């Protein structure tokens, strides 16, 4: 289990990267225009919409020098501005993750893997 950790005057706090990814994914799903996280099948190159339980597979968390970098692989709604959706996602996730973890979010990369028409 990879973990992001920080030292405090009372001891060490370790937060699993999986927990950070889950929190970031939940925050992302609250953003307008995000349909879900994308999982890529390396074998055949197909992109699939991940279920809520496995959405962390569409998010990669990296910690370097006490700063977080996140890679999101997302599917967006048809007809929305991808730039507006990405800006909203970055702002929301950065703010909420910094409040949640106490770590600085240095960079959020967004990879739009698909578009889905919502009924």
Regions found by a protein language model. Give the residues of each.
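Contiguous, often N-terminal, cationic amphipathic patches that form binding interfaces
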Residues: 1-76, 82, 87, 103-109, ...
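Conserved amphipathic alpha-helical interaction elements at protein-protein interfaces in regulatory
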Residues: 78, 95, 99-100
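A short beta-strand micro-motif common to beta-rich folds, especially ectodomain repeats
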Residues: 89-93
């Amino acid at each position: 289990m990879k973990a992001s950790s920080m030292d405090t005057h009372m001891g060490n706090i370790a937060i699993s990267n999986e927990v950070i990814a889950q929190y970031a994914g939940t925050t992302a799903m609250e953003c307008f225009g995000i349909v879900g996280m994308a999982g890529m099948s390396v074998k055949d190159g197909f992109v699939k919409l991940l279920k809520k339980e496995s959405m962390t597979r569409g998010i990669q968390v990296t910690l370097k020098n006490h700063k977080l970098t996140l890679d999101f692989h997302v599917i967006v709604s048809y007809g929305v501005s991808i730039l507006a959706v990405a800006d909203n996602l970055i702002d929301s996730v950065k703010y909420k993750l910094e409040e949640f973890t106490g770590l600085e979010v240095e960079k959020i990369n967004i990879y739009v893997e698909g578009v889905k028409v919502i009924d």
